[in-house]
Amino acid sequence: EGKNLLDKNCDIRKFREEVGMVFQKFNLFPLKTVVQNVMMAPILTKHMNKEEAHAKALELLDKVGLKDKADVYPSTLSGGQQQRVAIARALAMEPKALLFDEPTSALDPEMVEEVLKVMVNLAKQGMTMIVVTHCLAIRSI
């Protein structure tokens, strides 16, 4: 949209709410279940009620193929599954764009494809993504 983030009149906090971030190391909360990880930000920042946040989280977990893992803890998931939870968590804030910092570099090679499939589906749905990576397979997105 051509926003000048250096402009003193730019509401940087509002801009940050429009951009999601997915990190290399997932950064999931280990003492929260998968669904709680996805629900947390909308409840705390958008003041969404818990029932609505739970329903939205389950919808997003289904979108990344992990609805059946909603009530487990991150430590029980593979790296690829944890990264997909991180993607669902970023999507829970309904961003206009997603930033990915090496989304596949911490994964075993066999887990890379499941994360790439989610990213391809997001691209097909029109999600703007900025990806920093060394993974050449991502070029096809």
Q: Model-flagged regions — what are they?
A:
Residues 1-141:
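ABC family nucleotide-binding domain
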